[in-house]
Amino acid sequence: MAFNFAAILAFVSLAAVTSAAPSKTTCSNGVVVPDAVCCDFVPLASALQSEVLMGDCGEDAHELVRLIFHDAIAISQSMGPSAGGGADGSMLIFPTVEPAFFPNLGIADSVNNLIPFLSQFPTISAGDLVQFAGAVAISNCPGAPQLEFLAGRPNATAPAIDGLIPEPQDDVTKILARFKDAGNFSPAEVVALLASHSIARADHVDPTLDAAPFDSTPFDFDTQIFLEVLLKGVGFPGLANNTGEVSSPLPVTDGTDVGELRLQSDFALARDERTACAWQSFVNEQEAMATAFKNAVKKLAVLGHNRNDLVDCSAVVPVPKPATGTPATFPASTGPQDLELTCTTEPFPTLSTAPGAQQTLIPHCSDGTMTCNSVQFDGPATNFGGADDS
């Protein structure tokens, strides 16, 4: 009998591939995932929305997005493992330590809001909870990308040391060095991570202001932040001479409708020759910005871990709300004459200007009202210290 060795080898190879293929599991919501562990996050997403986020890209969402960065960046290649474990949930495991550090002022709110979920979902680690909660939170913001989420981070065994969180008064050289030491982030990746400032607000940079936005559209994940930081400053939304703050182009405040607050670090990164072109490249480039942010967070979220040890549960991350489709626009009272451009190798896009001779107030709440829905659980974390870079 003649044997077809090519056919036999093909069959054996196919059998090997088939046997090595990961099994699939269908979760209760119909989502197919590579591992049953991913299904634990389906009810967690629902609980986060119903108990904290309420489907809104509001203050609670902003704070959870901030937490994914502050937890993960606390790691150092030069100082070694004793400095911090990166994306390990140490903020939640040691809530009386890291939230009290100077750069983490305000982080206690999101820490206390997440701590109850550790007992409610005991199979989910603190590190996974922090990263997943941030992914769920940003999905409420129109235009945001669907973030990758990998599960399986072990719980932190020690808190990170102080001094690893970049601060808004830091110069560009110090900021870039901190990111390189944390995880070999390039200057362009640092800028990409700052797309989160499109939905960020500050509570403590100016002690007289609550929820001061960084751009005029703080409830949309859009490129407006990259335009407005390039405009010349004309005033402050509250007090002047605050550490880490420089004048902004849209400072008008009326009650709880707080004017735009500009971080010194954003101002500097937008104008430094090492980062200016990356910054400018995102103006009116929604898809490019969202993709770059997703890729940078993908790197941030596994600091301190080996990707191969984790399970890809991205399928259970909610699909974000679609972008509004509104192009980047010069706010009323501003225009091309107000641009302060350092990057000369790339043309600046042609943009329209919103009508009006005076600044339009920036709404305090996503629905335009003065009183926003917000949740704040009691907990062990307390706020001390200095500037909040949200």
Swiss-Prot record:
Its main location: secreted. Glycans are attached at N155, N241. One of its GO terms (biological process) is response to reactive oxygen species. Mn(2+) binds at E59, E63, D203. Keywords: Calcium, Disulfide bond, Glycoprotein, Heme, Hydrogen peroxide, Iron, Lignin degradation, Manganese, Metal-binding, Oxidoreductase, Peroxidase, Secreted, Signal. Heme b binds at H197. This is Manganese peroxidase 2. The lineage of its organism: Eukaryota, Fungi, Dikarya, Basidiomycota, Agaricomycotina. GO terms for molecular function: heme binding; manganese peroxidase activity; metal ion binding. Its cofactor is heme b; Ca(2+). The gene is mnp2. Ca(2+) 2 binds at S198, D215, T217, D222. Belongs to the peroxidase family. Ligninase subfamily. Residues 1-23 form the signal peptide. Disulfide bonds join C27-C39, C38-C313, C57-C141, C277-C343, C365-C372. InterPro entries: Ccp1-like, Haem_peroxidase, Haem_peroxidase_sf, Ligninase, Ligninase_C, Peroxidases_AS, Peroxidases_heam-ligand_BS. It catalyses: 2 Mn(2+) + H2O2 + 2 H(+) = 2 Mn(3+) + 2 H2O. Its EC number is 1.11.1.13. Induction: By a combination of high manganese and malonate levels.
